[in-house]
């Protein structure tokens, strides 16, 4: 069997590394390969122009591989990483949505590791590295993965609210939603889907539990939010993790949940040498994540760093939302001019900074002790950084130098 891998990313490299002994050398296609070579394991590294669909039995793309790429158009046996491992996948929980996927997945893992659960997917560990004999797979599941998945399904699908994101990849918000909901048509009567109420009528055989907001979801699962130490925007993530635990074990481990430690880059608070508050929310790459961050600090004047790769999303609603805050904006990245135009239309004060270092310096000239400086850019980072995490590290280094 000849297996072709599209894209030289973490997912495909993990498959090639861990399964080369079972399936023999893989053919790995990537636009960066200009000539045919072999890696240390004997896998062929090929340019996409060398792909012959008649010589390939299965094609597996990296999750974010563009759907309009010529390889996707030519592939006859396309399947996702989830489909490829579905035959050995134990009981699984898939967690998706626009914001909060990672936190909810990590919280659920924190609550369920004692039963032998393992965590993977978009959260960092490819499926090729997960133990097929584990009791449970908890998978953070991106819209990219769902787009390419046509066979696999979970026993529990936990969907957090959906808002516009990755529209340049999916083509439209409608298509983005459709990919998020696509798994429901494969679920059966024994499965459970926790969905925002707006998606309740999506065709599925699964048992649907719908919710309007944090309070409603907590009520549906008899969860006492007073016993949860996390506040918005992480409260919904915590409630969802407890709901998953309740479905699987009929328990609610509040004390264990409250011991969970948040990861970096999400509303990570830092004090500078003058005791002023800076917040690293570099992972906020869409408008709903920024709105959640703004709401958290609504009682303070906010100095917001915004901009980067906007991924083709119209952010007009976000700037209209900002009108209700005491806020000043600092535009960075490839979308600097676009951010300044949004601000002008919304009658918001904005500074043209272009780079993060200049934004931090400019904010430092204005920031008072009772105010907050917030990096919550509403945009991806790859126009100027290798990742959102690097953007966060640069932000923190700039603060140290003040």
From Swiss-Prot:
The gene is murD. The keyword Cytoplasm applies. Keywords: ATP-binding, Cell cycle, Cell division, Cell shape, Cell wall biogenesis/degradation, Cytoplasm, Ligase, Nucleotide-binding, Peptidoglycan synthesis. NCBIfam families: murD. Pathway: Cell wall biogenesis; peptidoglycan biosynthesis. Pfam families: Mur_ligase_M. GO terms for molecular function: ATP binding; UDP-N-acetylmuramoylalanine-D-glutamate ligase activity. It catalyses: UDP-N-acetyl-alpha-D-muramoyl-L-alanine + D-glutamate + ATP = UDP-N-acetyl-alpha-D-muramoyl-L-alanyl-D-glutamate + ADP + phosphate + H(+). This is UDP-N-acetylmuramoylalanine--D-glutamate ligase. ATP binds at residues 97-103. Cell wall formation. Catalyzes the addition of glutamate to the nucleotide precursor UDP-N-acetylmuramoyl-L-alanine (UMA). Its EC number is 6.3.2.9. The keyword Cell cycle applies. It is found in: Cytoplasm. Coiled coil: none annotated. Its main location: cytoplasm. One of its GO terms (biological process) is peptidoglycan biosynthetic process. Signal peptide: none annotated. One of its GO terms (cellular component) is cytoplasm. Belongs to the MurCDEF family.
